[in-house]
Amino acid sequence: MGLLDEAIAQFQKALRAPEGRLKTSEQLGISFFDKGRFAIAEAVLRRAIESLAGGDEDKIGLIYWLGRALESQRRFEEALRFYERALAVDIRLLDVGDRVHRLTTGAQ
């Protein structure tokens, strides 16, 4: 079992606890993303966004990484919607501004 697989197993175990579920879900999604399992990352991140309490300010990492997972699946319009949602909360978040620019100018 590789390090990412071990991390995934630990994040999945941690999700059983009620505290810290937003960050744990984000890290689990990123781990699947890093493994190239974009559809699974999408499912994890989307489920967390839809089911966990909190606003976009609390879920900004989940929203950004869902955009990344969608973009990696070449679902550019959907990715753009999530990037713009993240941009509305924090214009300086990682490379979200560059990603929005690329997707809106067709420079994928």
PLM ranges: what are they?
Residues 27, 64-65, 99:
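"A position-specific structural signal for the A-helix of alpha-solenoid helical repeats
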Residues 45-50, 76-95, 101:
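TPR/TPR-like (Sel1-like) alpha-helical repeat modules
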